């Protein structure tokens, strides 16, 4: 009987070793996945730092004009607009959110504003 119990012990040890190997492999895969995700986040942050531009929730580039004021180019109902908007920091999420203070200019309005810039500059 001792030989059968020792073979059972060996079998149990073998099964336990295999389970540990599987757990180790699973943990390795999980840690590799976490590491890959961290690298992707770092890469995205680096790209943002290199370009010096933020992006809004729709993926549009945000050009900083001043303190929490940004210009973006976006499409709405098939037309492109230049949006100049003031942002605020949300208390709960600590994310930058657009405020109601802002203006959207069509391409024609944007072109008019650009043409008026020399005259406006003379007033300063």
Curated annotation (Swiss-Prot):
Residues 11-21, 39-58 have a biased composition (Basic and acidic residues). GO terms for molecular function: DNA binding; transcription coactivator activity. Residues 1-61 are annotated as: Disordered. Gene3D superfamilies: Transcriptional Coactivator Pc4, Chain A (2.30.31.10). Keywords: Activator, DNA-binding, Nucleus, Transcription, Transcription regulation. It comes from the Eukaryota. One of its GO terms (cellular component) is transcription regulator complex. Belongs to the transcriptional coactivator PC4 family. This is Putative RNA polymerase II transcriptional coactivator.
């Amino acid at each position: 009987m001792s030989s059968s119990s020792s073979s059972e012990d060996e079998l149990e040890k073998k099964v336990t070793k295999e389970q540990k190997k599987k757990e180790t492999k699973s943990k390795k895969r999980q840690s590799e996945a976490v590491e890959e995700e961290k690298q992707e986040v770092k890469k995205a942050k680096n790209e943002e730092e290199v370009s010096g531009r933020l992006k809004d929730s729709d993926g549009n580039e945000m050009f900083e004009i001043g303190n929490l004021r940004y210009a973006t180019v976006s499409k709405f109902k098939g037309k492109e607009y230049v949006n100049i908007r003031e942002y605020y920091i949300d208390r709960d999420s600590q994310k930058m959110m657009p405020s109601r203070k802002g203006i959207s200019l069509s391409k024609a309005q944007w072109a008019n504003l650009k043409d008026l810039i020399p005259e406006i500059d003379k007033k300063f």
